[in-house]
Amino acid sequence: MKKINPNNTESWKMLQNHFYEIKSFHIKELFKKDKNRFKKFSLKFDNRILVDYSKNRITSFTIKLLLKLANEMDLNNSIKSMFSGKIINETENRAVLHTALRNRSNSSIIHNGCNIMFDINKVLEKMKHFSNLVINRKWLGYTGKYITDIVNIGIGGSDLGPKMVIKALNSYRNHLNIHFVSNVDGANIFNVLKKLNPESTLFIIVSKTFTTQETIVNANTAKKWMLNAVNKNEFLDQHFIAVTTNAQEAMNFGIRYKNIFLFWDWVGGRFSLWSSVGLSIVLAVGFKNFEQLLDGAYMMDQHYLHTKFDNNIPVLLALIGVWYNNFFKSETEAIFFYDWNMNYFSSFLQQMNMESNGKNICRSGEFVNWQTGPIIWGEPGTNGQHAFYQLLHQGTKLIPSDFIISIIPKHPFKDHHKYLLSHFFAQTQALAFGKFNQKCNVHINDKKTFDERLSSISFHKVCKGNQPSNSIVLDQLNPYNLGILIALYEHKVFTQGVIFNIFSFDQWGVELGKLLAKEIFLNMNTTGSKNYEYDSSTNGLINFYKIHSNNT
């Protein structure tokens, strides 16, 4: 990948000038000037998904300049480099090949001289066989009872992706109960274990290195809990599975090789749900539905790889995001999924985006002097409307938003869904167009007081609008469409990383926190108050802990 600073490109300078020209334009005026604006700025994917980006503060010339920026930043070759397995994660000397995990054409993908599709298919077949045993009640616990509860122990990408997908596909769930333990806070695992019977519980320990502190602490607690019931280590075989790249560490923990599901160092954690990390997904919804998830992602991969940028959905959404982030200085981006089962989606995208593009060093190894990844946040509709939409409608911040919904619900209450859709359509309209001539119902007898009161309240009811949004409408939320949607956002994040000239697939900030926590943990276990080699604040916090923990 080329190392090009975006603000040195001709298109960046042109975009800056263009921004000054149109920054005061109102979305409602853009619609008035162009009766075909929706048609011009919307795309359909596979006749299943509509992406409407017409309610943005853009013109055709804006898109033209953004596409010019993508070309100047060598985006096309960067995409090809990722898909072909070149070392684009340079700081860790790794390829980035999560797309290979859903390569449904099964065409050869060569990495380090080997066709990795052989290993991918082998693991998929193992996942299929194992999940069939568990789902069909043929995998039995130490007393001969069939498994009723699965506990996925992992954090970050080993937790958020599978948890999001399983909740999203709630209507496809089988009889198995799936639980997630991620936080090292003991309350997390305590609240899960107290509901379970060890005779019918299966633990899946998910860790890329099998050394992640939070995961291993929780795994050891689960192991002790199980041993209290079974008393014999050999009985653990029926109750512990590992998903990792480090088989040796998993075996050191006590998990036999036959119970280990491998993945590879070219799979980043936040992009790993397509691998054996998705074993809990397979157990929850069955292997056929997992294949549909892969199929959908593969279709979006092909769209991203082969479609010209002016019709390329991930590229266009990414570039529009850059437009707000780097020229309007918007800083945040909201995700509003109007589906209760998608309540983990914004958290999932938060990790995908902020861990990938929350960087201040460019690919040349210098500090950037432009904005990189935005702050991602969100809440399912309509709850958010009664929490923070007020700020969107009448606050002082520019907050671009993605609104997502499906047409056909997965529940029988059709009237509920019509109400939900009406809110969805209304909010994007209100945010874009606002309301300037408010009517006010005030019941006051005195005419003069009434007129004064009416004028005062009407002014407070003004909503200026001009808040941009994209609308993504699915025909229905099924595994195939969910695969499309997740892959769309993955490629959006990568595209923005290319434009920002950063490495999107490392996370050295996360690693720093891990190292410091290990060191501080050792100091917490020493006796007496001390002045450790930290700042006075950290020393004071540790010593306050010691004083009060000794009093309990």
Curated annotation (Swiss-Prot):
Chief localisation class: cytoplasm
Q: Where is the active site?
A: 355, 386, 514
Q: Name one GO molecular function term.
A: monosaccharide binding
Task: Extract the Gene3D superfamilies matched here.
Answer: 1.10.1390.10, Glucose-6-phosphate isomerase like protein, domain 1 (3.40.50.10490)
Task: Give the matching Pfam families.
Answer: PGI (PF00342)
Q: What class of enzyme is it?
A: isomerase
- May I have one GO cellular component term? cytosol
List the InterPro entries: G6P_Isomerase, G6P_Isomerase_C, Phosphoglucose_isomerase_CS, SIS_dom_sf, SIS_PGI_1, SIS_PGI_2
Question: Which pathway is this protein engaged in?
Answer: Carbohydrate biosynthesis; gluconeogenesis; Carbohydrate degradation; glycolysis; D-glyceraldehyde 3-phosphate and glycerone phosphate from D-glucose: step 2/4
EC number(s) on record? 5.3.1.9
Q: Domain of life of the organism in this record?
A: Bacteria
Record-level GO BP terms? gluconeogenesis; glucose 6-phosphate metabolic process; glycolytic process
What is catalysed by this protein? Answer: alpha-D-glucose 6-phosphate = beta-D-fructose 6-phosphate
Keywords tagged on the record: Cytoplasm, Gluconeogenesis, Glycolysis, Isomerase
* Location in or out of the cell: Cytoplasm
> What family does this chain come from, according to its entry?
Belongs to the GPI family.
Question: What is the stated purpose of this protein?
Answer: Catalyzes the reversible isomerization of glucose-6-phosphate to fructose-6-phosphate.
What protein name does the entry list?
Answer: Glucose-6-phosphate isomerase
